[in-house]
């Protein structure tokens, strides 16, 4: 499809949704969120291997990302803090008993419909909830004890390959800058160069189709 046949209507004055990055002279640099990325974001990386880098001629955004994380892989020497910034000394350990491991495996293999009305506290006891494994997991994925056990199970299945990198964040990958500057801007420029029409500060209140 020709780019000039594509129209993107955006209620905000900037592209990217929650990936936005805004410099406000009064508030400083404001960014509503960031994504913890990893190797198996296949759809994202398949998209960005076609988007040219804004900084490196002849390279794609994916090339840029790959080179950065190969040269400077993510790693944390202090995984958690206590008492206003003191090292919690989790020391790379999970502190899971055999019983705790079995509770996690049981959840992993439980049918979805058996978890519809259950919380994490319903399926884990203190063997898991007092472990450093749970500290790692809940701080990486923003889980609370009262959250859905089904959601927990689905996260386990999606991110099982991250288990080994939980104690030091080595499973995570990051862009060079915030994700607005590293992902949204290159994509926006690529689309604009192809003739795509962006209309900001535009809210759609109704759509009328004329079938002929």
Feature roles, as predicted:
Residues 2-4, 58-59, 199:
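Short helix-terminating capping/connector loops at secondary-structure junctions
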Residues 11-14, 42, 203-205, 209:
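An acidic- and aromatic-residue-enriched active-site/binding cleft used to recognize and process polar
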Residues 102-212:
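Active-site/ligand-binding neighborhood in enzyme catalytic cores
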